[in-house]
Each structure stands twice: as C-alpha cells, then as structure tokens.
Design a protein with these regions (language model features):
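N-terminal glycine-rich, Lys/His-bearing helix-loop that initiates the first secondary-structure elements
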Residues: 1-53
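Glycine-centered tight turns that cap/initiate beta-strands
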Residues: 78, 148, 303-306, 351, ...
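Glycine-rich beta-alpha junction loops
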Residues: 18-20, 33-39, 209, 226-228, ...
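Short, well-ordered beta-strand elements within core beta-sheets of diverse protein domains
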Residues: 272-282, 329-337, 392-396
Length: 414
C-alpha cells in the first residue's frame, strides 16, 4: 500500500508496519528474538556477508525487529538510513569510535549532557583533540576549528541548562568547511525539529527518552540525513566504500561501531520503542504544553531565582527556539533562591518522581549538581552554567493542575 503524500507523521508511523509487509493481517511487525539467521545455501550466506544482497547473519549487527524500528526512525528524521544501539550513549560512542582516528579533532558544545561530556574527555585521553565551545555562538565554533577538525557535535537544547545551539549558523559553517555536523536531537525529538533542515549530516537520538516515552526500554540511534558528502570524509575505510557515497558513513558505523563494539539494541526493547514512537506527537504536544505552563508559573514565584525553558520570552535563545522548533520541549530547569534547600524541596514533591531519567510520560525531577554532574567538579559545572541549587524537571503528561499543585505545596513547605 502506497502512502499518500498529504499524510501526517502520526498516520505514517501508525501504518508503517503493515505497509512494509506483515503476515496474517497483523498491524505490527513481529518480534524476532533469534540471535542468528540461517540460509539454504552457502552462496546465499556469503552474499549477505559481502553486502551483495540484503539480509541478517548475526543479531549483534542487526535483526528484522531492529530493522523495522530503524525504518520508522529514518522516516521520523527524513533520512536515508538509521543504525540502532543499546542506549543513546552507545550510539554516540559507537559513532565517534567508528569515524575518528588518533589526532583527529572534535569541536563540541560545552553545554552537554554529563555522560556525553565525560565520553569526550575519555576520547581526548586516547589521543583525539577536543575543544569545547559556546554552541549558542557560531563564531565561537568557527574560532575552534583547526585543520585536524573532523566533526562538530552539539545538542539542540542542552540538558539541563536548556541553552539552544546556534543550529542554523553552525550548519552553514560546517557545510562551507566540509565538516561532519552531528546533532543530538533527544531534547527536541524529530517531531519538534529535524536537524536535517539546518544541515546536520548525522542525528543522534536517545530512544530511551521521548521517542520510546514509557520508561520501559533503553535504546539509541544514529540517522544519516543524506546531507553530508561522505566522499569528502578522510576516515572512510576502503571496505565500506560500496555503492553511492551517501551510504558509506552509516555502513562504517554499523560495522566498526555496532558490530565491533557490540552495543546492540535488544529486539524486545526495539519492539517496545517502535510501539511507543507511534504516539510521539500526541505525547510531546501534551508534555511541551505542561512544561511551558509550569515554567511560566514558576518564573512568577517569589521563592524561585531563575527558570530555564526555551519557550519563555526571557530565555536568551527564545527567538531561535520559536523559529526552529514546534514547541520549546518538555525539559526545564530552575534555581531556588539562596534561602531554600533544593533537596528539601524535592523531598516535598509527591506526584513528581525523584529520578535521573527524562523524556518519560511521568514528570521527573533531580538535583543535577549533586547527582549526574557531581563528577565534573565545581569549576566545570560553573562553566556549563550549572548552579548548586539547579533542579532539572522532565515534564510528563499528567494533568497540569496536579503538577502545579505539587510544586506549589513543595515551595510553600521550604
């Protein structure tokens, strides 16, 4: 069955499985837990190994269930292909290990998720150059580029400070310099924003977060948008220069990243994530509305020093966020005034769960300086804009009145 050109994203996601071919009239692709795949003849097996025909040989580098999810993710990002991984961090690590060599240079935002920042520090210790920049200013990115620079890495909306990268200008800069532009789209999701529109060559998503949405599966993905010319990338090995250049990068990521590192997405997790993705638009609309309403209310409270959310007109990058994104996202953060204890405040919350996760249907909160960023040290946290009293809130889809009442009670108690 052919899709209609006028169909919306949710319609296409809901009907992707049956249009891709399913047995017995099923509306979902089946779960394939097999770890290996057999063929009738040795020649067939050899041809799949050599990439001469499509198929699966060993589930570490792919299986039909993961492939069905990858098809949906490619649709979401309007890309040319996707490789799925066990987690979002596995996706980032595998991408970087697969594409970089010793002495290559990375330009990255200094406003990054703590584990991503830690990974980049590890790569620096292994011989890659690293320059951290203010990604809200493309001029700062440009100053950091050297002849050894291979890629630029940013997040759309930074976690947890909500800084919005200068996405369009950085994309133009990378295009002019022939650099690979990698954008982590986790905070916005492909429903709110497609990095392809600003020139991103590769897009990373943590599927554990809003795309899966239900907090019941770990996963990550790298999608090739088709924008980057891989024939210009010096690090593509000869075995992966097969067919048109647009497929080279993702093939090397699947082989040197997924196959060799082995951070494979479990088939049952892929199945749950694919189901969750079908309601992405509905969930994001609700969560983003809740987040903006809660942020607006918090910003007016006397016990709150600062609120960070791109949807607020007071946000430094509000104009860009409004121009690029359908909404400001479901993540916000805020600081209490100096007289209030952020840990005591969190203890007073009842509906909101104290958890390090985000992108869940449930609203979650965490004191970031004391938990996920404590390893960074005070000086590094200060450079990243993370105050000791900063609380990150991943806003879910609960009834807004219940969330506001929960925060109101907690503020009154401290």
């Amino acid at each position: 069955m052919e899709k209609k050109a006028s169909e919306g994203l949710t319609t296409r996601l809901l009907h992707a499985d049956r249009r891709g071919g399913v047995e017995h009239g099923a509306t979902h692709k089946p779960l394939h837990p097999s770890s290996a795949f057999g063929y009738d003849t040795a020649r067939e097996l050899v041809s799949v190994f050599k990439g001469e025909r499509s198929g699966h040989v060993y589930a570490r580098q792919g299986n039909p269930t993961n492939a069905a999810l990858e098809t949906k993710l490619t649709l979401l990002e309007d890309g040319v292909g996707t490789v799925s991984f066990a987690t979002g961090m596995a996706a980032i690590a595998s991408l970087l290990v697969a594409l970089l060599k010793r002495d290559d240079h990375i330009v990255a935002s200094r406003f990054l998720f703590g584990n991503t920042a830690s990974l980049l520090n590890t790569l620096e210790g292994l011989g890659c150059g690293l320059t951290l920049v203010d990604a809200t200013d493309a001029a700062d990115v440009e100053r950091a580029i050297t002849p050894r620079t291979r890629l630029v890495f940013v997040e759309t909306i930074a976690n947890p400070g909500t800084q919005v990268a200068d996405l369009e200008a950085i994309g133009k800069l990378c295009g002019e310099r022939g650099l690979l532009y990698v954008v982590d789209n986790t905070m916005t999701t492909p429903y709110l924003f497609r990095p392809k529109t600003v020139g991103a060559g590769l897009v990373v998503n943590s599927l554990t977060k809003s795309i899966g949405g239900h907090g019941n599966a770990l996963g990550g993905a790298v999608t090739d948008t088709g924008v980057f010319d891989w024939s210009r990338f010096a690090n593509i090995a000869e075995p992966y220069k097969k067919g048109e250049p647009r497929g080279w990068g993702l093939l090397q990521i699947r082989k040197r990243g997924l196959r060799d590192i082995g951070a494979t997405l479990a088939a049952d997790a892929a199945h749950r994530i694919a189901t969750g993705a079908e309601t992405l638009a509905l969930r994001m609309d609700r969560a983003c509305d809740n987040a903006l309403r809660l942020a607006t209310w918090l910003a007016a409270q006397p016990g709150v020093k600062r609120v960070n959310h791109p949807g607020l007109e007071t946000h430094p990058q509000h104009a860009n966020a409004k121009r690029w994104f359908k909404a400001g996202g479901a993540l916000m953060s805020f600081e209490l005034d100096d007289a209030r204890d952020c840990l005591a405040f969190l203890d007073r919350l009842d509906v909101v769960i104290k958890s390090s996760h985000l992108g869940d249907n449930r609203t979650l909160a965490i004191p970031v300086a004391h938990t996920i960023f404590w390893e960074m040290g005070a000086q590094r946290r200060q450079a990243m804009g993370i105050a000791d009293s900063l609380i990150r809130v991943s806003v879910g889809i609960e009834d807004h009145e219940d969330l506001r009442a929960d925060f109101e009670r907690a503020l009154a108690a401290v």
